[in-house]
A protein has these predicted regions:
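Thiamine diphosphate
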Residues: 40-43, 50-51, 424-543, 547, ...
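Subset of Sec-pathway N-terminal targeting signals
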Residues: 42-83, 87
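Extended, charge-enriched "interface" segments that sit outside catalytic cores
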Residues: 83-279, 295
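Glycine/aspartate-rich loop-and-adjacent alpha/beta segment that forms the canonical ThDP
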Residues: 140-143, 147-180, 184-192, 196, ...
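Active-site cores of enzymes that catalyze phosphoryl transfer or operate on phosphate-rich substrates
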Residues: 235-257, 323-375, 379-386, 817-886
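Cofactor-binding active-site loop characterized by glycine-rich and histidine/acidic residues
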Residues: 296-460, 464, 668-724
Length: 992
């Protein structure tokens, strides 16, 4: 009705079609000049009905006109009369009517509830019940897993969850046979089901031995995917007879190995899998299904629990080789070695889709830290294959329930999962949930969440909880987990709830602290026995289980497998050849200089920025200066030295991967390897990376601004470098002080990985280090800790002090076929210190210097008069040179030790011999006496001194904190240590 009455009313508000404008001149206001024009417009706005502010007034006039045409002024009446001859908006000739009576009519009807739907009370009741049924369905999807039959020990009753009962929604027994719409479920092709059938279907699907959490996922497509998988099958696996026999075979192998080791090697640690044998069936299914889907490599990370079982029954390690390790007859070729349950292993196995390479990562006892290492290894393999989505490489991480919930590195690793620089296309997580962490089994002490898996909800990973005593449900859960990962490229978690038959290790007595749990365990017949009895009841043979067990035991007695799963003659074209890097020495020569013509060509390429890129003025200045440096017009600074090292390497075929919290720009804005267009209109576009445009066939250059994590990111890069010796992999700390946030990675992998496991790794660490008054958290990369870890030529520790030195040491890391971790203590103030710049000759006609000798020509000329030699490392050198100049001394020589480990004995000895009459050698450092290099270099310096020379120390006093927080105190300390370097020796000295 209102629409009809508005037929011409719209015309009142329609703008007049433009045409010749006639200005009606108000009396007494001449229209002349700009001022007059403005006054006219003001008059026009206040009088014109076209002005929006007058619309309510015009509407009111029009209402009055429709009610009584004579009630409005003549000029308005004439206008409204003419308006009635204009066709309505819908083209009809209907006449407008007043709105006011119509509006009032609607108001009265609303008061009288005249619009209420006329429906029977019976219809309303049915509709309400349908809504309640939908609520019940939603409740099972959300909460069903909490009522699932998941605990093999059945230690507690199922919790009471009112929302899963029909009565919670007002539904009673009388409603059970009423049919309701089931259109939003996948239980049946029928559109309707009785409430009884719906309830049974919900309980079968969500509350059996498999409980799935997926409703926390925000993407509707993924939720529907899970609903369809679960509801269409009622979560019930369908296995053929042969598949069931194969599952029993895997359970038999898992239990058989543990029983064999338990009786043959009594009391020896092996961290038994007993109670969690379904895990081996899960791994077997995962590998076979992954191979069928085109996966060609699976990288596995896991802790000690069940590891020996995986080595033998999953990866195909020969039982006799494992027994040799127990018997201590296995070859011991490594300097240190490691226990058997930390060992890694690689093999190639047959699957329906072809050979699959399996790799179990070496790992320490520090739980979960191997996870980001595995992810890094996977990313390296993906990059090598050009596998952008993770179609060919699959990461599989195996966790314990207590560690998964308790170790913070898991949160950091999950945070990497969907980022551009670290994504691996989704990880399959399997949790051996034996419901106990060492001696802790009370959930009130284990964690602060309902499930150990709750941390993954932050990345919206689905979780499948499954009863380990139902191996067929475990197999089904594995299939769905893999399908989800391959479909959506996201993490997925399979939580296998089982138990730990023995103690934490075989020397432990768990009933001391878990008497109730271990009474239950003592009464449990074992998963293999339960499943064998189930198959026997299905008519698959009463003696099937016993026959399999005897056959497996017999094979172990002979040190072999019942079926050899390993392909011995398969060689993937993507396998890495480490032979060129074996047996190398750190003293091997490396030509790191580049020809001048090549220098200029590369410099021009990395400083030629497209005109379409609108650079920030400060960044433009940096690149203009770099262009001048490339031409030899300016001395080369640190940022240019880095860039030229990178450019020369990628142009020679060495990929570069650099990551850190501010690596693109550099913490101290010296790098600018990523140029941001200042006029870009999209946040995800408008960057330009000059080092990606060095040559047409160059190797990749990737710089990543990482998430705010040290531990997981450094471990990831270690894993990457350990799988790709041809790539220069760099991790840069924002400040070196924060590197100890990843101390576990440094201690357990970087420092000791080679002597424990024989794993070489060329990872480079850049740790900004230097005492410049920024306090205890922004001064020290803890040089002393790396010096303490240095042994067996396990790493290289370098503190370069010039642009040329950083250029050569970065190139040396790749050009020389030695893959050892390189720890660079990089500067802060030296990044812009002109004294730290270098000439072109330093790049084109020189190399890396482990020790930089005296450079002052006057001191060198008067070498015989030198009485004191000051040795140092790092930026303190420039403070010492400045002080010597102030004092006008020519009898003091200053040496820089650029490489602190491996210590350059021959070079230092040669430098000291240049000053035969020196009686004193002083080690000067910025760091406190108990920190820095002093305690680790004094014996090396002493070894190379001349007879009769005394060695002393000049530096800060021992301190519990790396640096002071008071600026004035820092200055006082710095002045004192520089003065001490030139003053009388005090305190402890060593005489040769």
């Amino acid at each position: 009705l209102l629409n009809e009455t508005t037929a011409r009313r719209v015309a009142i508000r329609q703008p007049v079609k433009p045409g010749p404008r006639k200005v009606v001149e108000p009396i007494g206001v001449p229209v002349t000049g700009a001022k007059g024009e403005r006054m006219l417009m003001q008059q026009y706005r206040s009088n014109s009905y076209l002005f929006g502010g007058n619309a309510p007034y015009v509407e009111e006039l029009y209402e009055a006109y429709l009610d009584n045409p004579g009630s409005v002024p003549d000029n308005w009446r004439a206008y409204f009369d003419n308006l009635q001859h204009v066709p309505a908006v819908d083209g009809s000739d209907s006449r407008d009517v007043a709105h006011a009576p119509v509006v009032e009519s609607f108001a009265q009807r609303a008061k009288a509830n005249a619009f209420a739907l006329k429906a029977s009370s019976a219809d309303l009741a049915v509709a309400q019940k349908q809504v309640h049924v939908q609520s019940l369905i939603a409740a099972y999807r959300f909460l069903g897993s909490r009522w699932a039959d998941l605990d093999p020990l059945k230690r507690t009753e199922r919790p009471k969850i009112p929302e899963l009962e029909p009565s919670f929604y007002g539904l009673s027994e009388s409603d059970m046979d009423i049919t309701f719409s089931a259109a939003n479920t996948y239980f049946s092709k029928a559109e309707q089901m009785s409430l009884r059938d719906i309830l049974q279907a919900l309980r079968d699907t969500y509350c059996g031995t498999l409980g799935v959490e997926f409703m926390h996922i925000t993407e509707p497509t993924e939720k529907r995917w899970w609903q369809e998988r679960l509801e269409s099958t009622r979560s019930k696996p369908v296995l053929s007879v042969e598949q069931k026999k194969h599952v029993l075979d895997r359970l038999t192998a898992a239990e058989g190995l543990e029983r064999y080791l338990h009786t043959k090697y009594v009391g020896q640690k092996r961290f038994s899998l007993e109670g969690g044998e379904s895990f081996i069936a899960a791994m077997d299914e995962l590998i076979q299904q992954a191979g069928a889907k085109g996966v060609q490599e699976i990288i596995i990370g896991m802790a000690h629990r069940g590891r020996l079982n995986v080595l033998v029954n999953t990866l195909g390690k020969m039982p006799k080789d494992l027994f040799a390790e127990f018997d201590h007859t296995a070859p011991e070729e490594l300097p240190a070695g490691d226990v058997k349950y930390h060992q890694g292993f690689s093999s190639d196995v047959s699957t329906p889709g072809g050979p699959v390479h399996l790799s179990l990562a070496f790992n320490p006892s520090h739980l979960e830290i191997v996870n980001p290492v595995v992810e890094g290894s996977v990313r390296a393999r993906m990059d090598r294959r050009g596998d952008k989505r993770g179609d060919q490489v699959l990461p599989v991480l195996v966790h314990g329930d207590a560690a998964f919930a308790g170790q913070g590195v898991n949160q950091e690793t999950l945070a990497l999962a969907q980022t551009r620089g670290y994504s691996t296309g989704g990880t399959v997580h399997l949790i051996i949930n034996n419901q106990i962490g060492f001696t802790t089994s009370d959930p009130r002490d284990l964690r602060s969440t309902l499930y150990c898996t709750d941390i993954v909800k932050g990345v919206e990973a689905p979780v499948l909880h499954v009863n380990g005593d139902d191996p067929e449900a475990v197999v089904l859960a594995v299939r769905w987990s893999l399908e989800y990962r391959m479909e959506f490229r996201k993490d997925v978690v399979l939580d296998i709830i089982c138990f730990r038959k023995l103690g934490h290790n075989e020397q432990d007595t768990p009933s001391l602290t878990q008497p109730l749990m271990y009474k239950k365990i003592a009464q449990h017949p074992g998963t293999r026995k339960l499943y064998a009895d189930k198959l026997a009841a299905q008519g698959l043979g009463q003696n099937l289980g016993d026959d399999m067990f005897k056959a497996y035991r017999s094979a172990l007695d002979e040190g072999r497998h019942t079926v050899d799963p390993v392909l011995t003659d398969f060689k993937s074209k993507y396998a890495v050849d480490w032979l060129p890097y074996l047996g190398r020495k750190w003293t091997d020569a490396a030509d790191t200089a580049i020809p001048l013509a090549e220098w200029k060509r590369l410099a021009e390429r990395i400083t030629t920025i497209p005109e379409t890129v609108n650079m920030h003025p400060l960044v433009k200045k940096v690149y203009d200066d770099r262009a001048a440096m490339g031409r030899g017009e300016l001395r080369v600074d640190w940022g240019m030295g880095e860039h030229m090292a990178f450019a020369s390497l990628v142009s020679s075929g060495y990929p570069i991967r650099m990551s850190g919290e501010d690596s693109g720009r550099g913490t101290f804005t010296h790098r600018h390897s990523v140029i941001h267009d200042q006029k870009r209109e999209r946040w995800d576009e408008g960057t330009y990376v000059p080092l990606q445009h060095v040559a047409e066939n160059q190797a990749p250059f990737l710089v990543i601004d990482s998430i705010l994590s040290e531990e997981a990111v450094l471990a990831f890069e270690y894993g990457y470098a350990g799988s790709d010796p041809n790539t220069l992999v760099i991790w840069e700390a924002q400040f070196g002080d924060f590197a100890n946030g990843a101390q576990v990675v440094i201690d357990q992998f970087i420092a000791s990985g080679e002597v424990k496991w024989g794993r070489q790794n060329g990872l480079t660490l850049m740790l900004p280090h230097g005492y410049e008054g920024q306090g205890p958290e922004h001064s020290s990369a803890r040089l002393e800790r790396f010096m303490q870890l240095a042994a067996d030529t396990n790493m290289q520790i370098v503190q370069p002090t010039t642009a040329a030195q950083i250029f050569h040491v970065l190139r040396r890391q790749m050009v020389r076929n030695l893959r050892k971790p390189l720890v660079l203590f990089t500067p802060k103030s030296l990044l812009r210190n002109k004294d730290a710049t270098s000439s072109l000759n330093d790049f084109t006609k020189s190399g890396f210097h482990t020790v930089i000798g005296e450079l002052n020509a006057d001191v060198v000329a008067a070498a015989a008069k030198v009485k004191r030699v000051i040795a140092c490392s790092g930026k303190v050198y420039y403070d010492l040179v400045k002080k010597r100049e102030e004092k006008g001394l020519n009898d003091v020589a200053i040496l820089r030790v650029e490489q602190l480990y491996p210590f350059p004995h021959k070079v230092l000895s040669a430098e000291l011999k240049k000053f035969p009459n020196a009686t004193e050698v002083v080690w000067c450092q910025d760091e406190p006496q108990n920190q820095g290099a002093w305690f680790f270099v004094q014996h090396n310096i002493h070894e190379n001194m001349l007879d009769g020379q005394r060695l002393g120390y000049a530096g800060r006093a021992a301190s519990a904190s790396p640096a002071v927080g008071y600026a004035h105190l820092h200055q006082d300390q710095q002045k004192a240590l520089i003065d001490a370097a030139f003053g009388k020796l005090k305190g402890f000295t060593l005489t040769k």
